[in-house]
């Protein structure tokens, strides 16, 4: 009975891709994300029983709940269900972190998941609830930052990203990057911290300087006329999964997805080569970037990409790479105030903003030289 219900739920999710998000099972229940897993487990089981009614009479012993990963903005759990001697069925429960609505547009995320899933990206949406969603389980391993840097995987990521950028999401296709950055800047510039040490660090920030940096970069990148695509915007190693047996790569977690600039999504991805330690010496050199670009621009004939197209994307990605640092720096300031997670968000602001300033001169020089030669500057 349990297995049949899960596959029914999957069919419901697929139908919802055509009929709208409201056709997906929903529950008003919420899960207390602050609880340790043993105390959280009864809430997770109760949620699954509420969403999938054919499980409502199952004993709790039929459910196994495990932690898959705990990101900065969400917690991912695997729920395995076995009824009697039937096959085991697995799904994932994603719990939103507290106050993440300040930096994530959840309705936009749910809208995108529906269509990205239909296009073959990510897990299928099986249900939604008060502070999270239930999705199909992906049998794959999360990549490490060093994995992303391997040429074979880099080329596959590039090919998949090209397909991702071709997905059409209904609604406005206006790029949201600068809207989001200016919203973050507005919120970040008026924060007050109860912790005096945090407040002292915060008070050293010149928001006039940050605002000028944002405006100057926007003015420069506007001249590039970069293509607008539906972008993932958070393509770090933790959001890439690989099933080696099937040689299948998965993009997951579309929390920050929006229409944006092609170069931003690529430049942001390159920043993530730095890994969790933020070692930006791992940022890809020109040869590694060109390898990625060839497989992104012409997956079938990567060696036939013109020098002109390679240079244009190189300038685009390395200009918007700076915008990625500004975005996540301001994001971190808001998280420093709103998030209960024990993470040095203020330190992360200074790290990302400092890297932006360090790279600015070289990137601006590259872009201006290109624009002058192309007659666009």
Regions inferred by a protein language model and the residue ranges of each:
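Juxta-kinase regulatory segment immediately upstream of eukaryotic protein kinase catalytic domains
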Residues: 2-66
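Eukaryotic beta-rich interaction modules
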Residues: 45-62, 71-74, 83, 213, ...
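Catalytic-loop of the protein kinase fold
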Residues: 230-232, 237
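Active-site activation/catalytic loop segments of kinase-like enzymes and analogous catalytic loops
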Residues: 263-305, 322-340
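Helical subdomain adjoining the active site within ATP-dependent kinase catalytic cores
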Residues: 305-377
